[in-house]
């Protein structure tokens, strides 16, 4: 089956510190996005890779490995995350794509096994996404004080890549009014079943300065350093 990967990197978030959005900040000597793109370009069965960017980031994007050679295609994002994803989905229309992976550009440590088992889950469901069960105690707070606890049974921390049968998620995005937190929300609004796949604690989204330090350590371990 033909599979495309959509890497969403059009956001402008700067919670990680510095002047650049987190996906463009350096990690182990390369932009975060360079690590993310490398993971999907090496993934078995992925025939096309689309990178969704903010228009202001085009020059940076063109310098990434794979872009100049045409192995990574650039798509300009929209005013929101779901609009950005839809732009990429529309760019694939008529290309014979059967499955699509949608991934946060700021998750550079996604493993080949996670990509493979997320795609495999599409054999029995139109959508699939990795998640990690919530293990910490959950509190409800008000005015800086704990006012109650929350049962964590059945609660998960969502991750990406989120995988879908292409035509199903394209139709879901076309029908959605916007404002979704992720593509699972878009899919469920269209009545699509989404399978939960075992996620990975190392598949972190680099958002704060401490996340970069942890990601650096994990990359060093993976490299045997």
Swiss-Prot record:
It catalyses: 2-C-methyl-D-erythritol 4-phosphate + CTP + H(+) = 4-CDP-2-C-methyl-D-erythritol + diphosphate. The keyword Nucleotidyltransferase applies. It is an enzyme of class 2 (transferase). GO terms for biological process: isopentenyl diphosphate biosynthetic process, methylerythritol 4-phosphate pathway. Transmembrane segments: none annotated. Its EC number is 2.7.7.60. GO terms for molecular function: 2-C-methyl-D-erythritol 4-phosphate cytidylyltransferase activity. SUPFAM superfamilies: Nucleotide-diphospho-sugar transferases. Pathway: Isoprenoid biosynthesis; isopentenyl diphosphate biosynthesis via DXP pathway; isopentenyl diphosphate from 1-deoxy-D-xylulose 5-phosphate: step 2/6. The record marks 152, 205 as: Positions MEP for the nucleophilic attack. Keywords: Isoprene biosynthesis, Nucleotidyltransferase, Transferase. The record marks 15, 22 as: Transition state stabilizer. Belongs to the IspD/TarI cytidylyltransferase family. IspD subfamily. Catalyzes the formation of 4-diphosphocytidyl-2-C-methyl-D-erythritol from CTP and 2-C-methyl-D-erythritol 4-phosphate (MEP). HAMAP family: IspD. This is 2-C-methyl-D-erythritol 4-phosphate cytidylyltransferase.
């Amino acid at each position: 089956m033909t599979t495309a990967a959509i890497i969403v990197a059009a956001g402008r978030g700067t919670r990680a510190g510095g002047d650049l959005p987190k996906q463009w900040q350096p990690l182990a000597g390369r932009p975060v996005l360079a690590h993310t793109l490398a993971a999907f370009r090496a993934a078995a069965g992925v025939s096309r890779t689309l990178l969704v960017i903010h228009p202001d980031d085009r020059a940076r994007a063109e310098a990434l490995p794979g872009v100049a050679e045409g192995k990574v295609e650039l798509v300009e994002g929209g005013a929101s995350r779901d609009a950005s994803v839809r732009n990429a989905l529309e760019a694939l229309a008529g290309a014979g794509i059967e499955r699509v992976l949608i991934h946060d550009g700021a998750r550079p440590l996604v493993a080949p096994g996670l990509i493979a088992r997320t795609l495999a889950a599409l054999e029995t469901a139109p959508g699939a996404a990795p998640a990690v069960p919530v293990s910490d105690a959950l509190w409800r707070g008000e005015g800086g004080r704990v006012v109650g606890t929350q049962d964590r049974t059945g609660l998960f921390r969502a991750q990406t890549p989120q995988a879908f049968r292409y035509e199903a998620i394209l139709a879901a995005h076309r029908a959605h009014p916007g404002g979704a937190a992720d593509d699972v929300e878009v899919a469920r609004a269209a009545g699509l079943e989404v399978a939960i796949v075992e996620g990975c604690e190392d598949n972190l989204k680099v958002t704060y300065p401490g996340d970069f330090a942890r990601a650096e350590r994990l990359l060093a371990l993976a490299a045997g350093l």
